[in-house]
A protein has these predicted regions:
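Charged, helix-rich terminal subdomains or tails
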Residues: 1-150, 154-629
């Protein structure tokens, strides 16, 4: 109560502070159950209960007003059973397409800085879009069920005004996307009308029907994205074979000169703002204005708005005296203030500013790795993740909020405090950077050994967080730090798709399609068993390091020809044998090693796992002067 009392002291009771009030209540009551009845589940927080109550109240009020219902007592109390069946609400969802291409389709120049800035910029585009729609409908953040990763779900009133406002909103936003990015980015939206009983899943399946209808509407819009005028406008641009390009993103319009280099306005603005955007230790605010400031760097946003970065003092000045001030956001911290929309949870962990530094700090071979991952069957989890009697909007909202917090904020702690390491002597946080971590989608780059460790930690943390109910599939590619960025993203995405195609998903693919495993198999069999044996035996055997390549080649040949040269394999193992006068302990270790290796080589699954383990071990011991071996 003291938290609420002290925070409310600086809040004025006007509409400008409604989101700040919500922030205070969220901070204080997110982990207090809404019900203390012993015969009820206590899985809905007091915050979510109050937030949804406020959202429904606003929707009901707008519905009553548009339908000229003025006798509230009669409609809501005397005839409440009838009202519960009326389609009072719209569940609206919007989804931005083209996010990945927008983020990754850049040159390797200042790649890490550009990647993280563009990722955060897209997050702000979605936040700005959501807040603009809410403002046009005179609603608040309470009406947001979920927002992140280019997706959003809102609870809106089922009125004609809402439907017309949504149509105008989508047209305005897509027009801005066309004007600024052509067909690269598009937003598709869809909604479904529903009653209170539908949201309570009074009739089994009525709640899941809402989301099926929304998904179908969005799919139809994405199939028919552009009108005839849109297409004519898109085709009106004539490219010149000799026209200049932005050195970062390769676009050929809205160009400017920066330090003698040709850069588009967006990349130039993001570069100037990048330190404020991506530095996790820098306290700043992201201020939205309806007029481009004269003396300050600003980046264009939809709806004729502009993004600039303020210190706390600059923000206070804007709030007080700038007539063009619209709203502001904070990152990973709660604040209150005039039209301070909300804090944005952001996975912003970063250990270095260049890929080359990450490669140099990696163990063994000097390479970076790219991790791409997302939750398996997330859509089905929201629609069918609960038994029918528990499948309600309260639980969907709670699940959405907690998943968003996990991937956008808790992931920073996962990176700062590693649990699993390939290199047991490493210390400190991960040698890596979070490029993008949305509602369920993750992109991490870093030293190859730390990225593999981070992937395992992330999987284990999600399993613990969801009590085993949610799984994640991932792809991890390993590259030189100068490898084209878009190709890194594309190749790692292909590896992720291979994992998604594995039986039961819940998998990770390393290197290429030949190294796809369920997480337990990778951790327990590949690393915990085979990699551990190689490390224990080979680390004290100089001959073993050079013979590993020959053993690896022999196993590969077995796979390709379905034949194993037993004599050759026995010869290679024999070369690892200790001298006749070696201690008994060393002889026993060798005998165990050779027997186990001989057993593994004759079994398809074990042989496959052994190949991956050898890859990992060779990478760990590879020295700079023989990386080309």
């Amino acid at each position: 109560m003291d938290i609420i009392k002290n925070s409310l002291a600086g809040i004025e009771y006007t509409s400008d502070y409604i989101n700040s009030l919500s922030e205070v209540f969220e901070a204080a009551t997110s982990y207090i159950p809404s019900s203390t009845q012993t015969n009820e589940l206590r899985d809905i927080s007091l915050y979510d209960h109050v937030k949804l109550t406020a959202a429904f109240s606003l929707c009901i009020f707008d519905y009553l007003c548009e339908n000229n219902i003025t006798d509230y007592k009669d409609a809501l109390f005397k005839n409440s059973d009838k009202f519960y069946d009326k389609p009072v609400f719209l569940i609206y969802s919007a989804d931005i397409s083209g996010i990945q291409n927008f983020i990754y389709n850049i040159s390797s120049k200042n790649a890490l800085k550009s990647l993280r800035s563009r990722s955060f910029y897209l997050e702000l585009i979605m936040e700005t879009a959501v807040d603009t729609l809410l403002d046009r409908l005179s609603l608040t953040k309470c009406n947001v069920m979920y927002s992140g990763g280019g997706h959003t779900y809102l609870i809106l009133p089922n009125t004609q005004n809402t439907k017309e406002t949504i149509k105008t909103f989508e047209n305005d936003l897509n027009k801005w996307f066309i004007d600024n990015y052509g067909t690269e980015i598009y937003i598709g939206g869809g909604y479904a009308a529903c009653s209170a009983n539908d949201l309570k899943n009074k009739t089994d399946g009525s709640y899941s029907r809402i989301f099926r209808e929304i998904s179908q509407n969005i799919s139809e819009k994405k199939m028919k994205r552009y009108s005839a005028p849109d297409i004519r406008k898109l085709n009106s641009h004539k490219s010149d074979d000799n026209e200049r390009e932005c050195v970062i993103c390769k676009r050929s319009d809205k160009l400017t000169e920066v330090n003698g280099k040709c850069i588009c306005e967006l990349c130039a603005g993001l570069l100037k703002l990048s330190d404020s955007i991506i530095d996790p230790n820098k306290k700043c605010f992201y201020t939205i204005l309806d007029c481009k400031p004269d003396q300050k760097t600003a980046v264009s946003l939809p709806f004729d708005l502009f993004l600039t970065v303020n210190s706390a003092d600059e923000l206070k000045e804007n709030m007080k005296n700038n007539e063009h001030y619209v709203r502001s956001y904070s990152k990973n911290s709660m604040n209150t203030g005039k039209r301070l929309s909300s804090r944005i949870w952001v996975g912003d962990y970063c250990s270095a500013k260049e890929f080359a530094i990450m490669a140099e700090n990696s163990c063994g071979i000097k390479r970076i790795a790219v991790l791409r991952a997302d939750i398996d069957n997330l859509g089905q989890t929201f629609v069918h993740g609960f038994d029918d009697k528990y499948n309600t909007i309260s639980r969907t909202s709670e699940l959405s909020a907690k998943l968003s917090l996990f991937f956008k904020y808790n992931i920073n702690s996962i990176m700062k405090k590693p649990v699993f390491r390939l290199n047991e002597n490493a210390e400190g946080g991960r040698n890596a950077a979070i490029i993008y971590s949305g509602g369920d989608d993750v992109f991490i780059v870093g030293g190859w050994d730390d990225v593999i460790g981070a992937a395992i930690d992330l999987n284990n943390a999600l399993r613990k967080f969801s009590c085993g109910a949610l799984t994640i599939s991932a792809g991890i590619g390993i590259y030189t730090p100068t490898y084209p960025l878009y190709s890194m993203a594309q190749n790692s995405g292909r590896l992720e798709d291979i994992s998604k195609g594995n039986a039961g998903k819940n998998s990770v693919t390393l290197f290429d399609e030949n190294h796809c495993y369920h997480w337990d198999e990778l951790c327990n069999k590949v690393i915990g068993e085979k990699y551990a044996l190689l490390r224990e035996f080979i680390s004290n055997n100089e001959k073993g390091k050079s013979l590993l390549y020959k053993i690896l080649e022999l196993i590969r040949c077995r796979k390709e020809s379905n034949k194993l040269n037993i004599a050759r394999f026995a010869y290679l193992l024999g070369r690892l044998a200790p001298d006749n006068n070696a201690p008994e302990e060393k002889v026993q270790k060798y005998n165990n090693f050779s027997n186990v290796m001989y057993s593994w080589i004759q079994n398809d699954e074990d042989a496959k796992q052994l190949i991956t383990a050898i890859y990992l071990y060779v990478y760990m011991i590879r020295e700079e002067n023989n990386e080309n071996e």
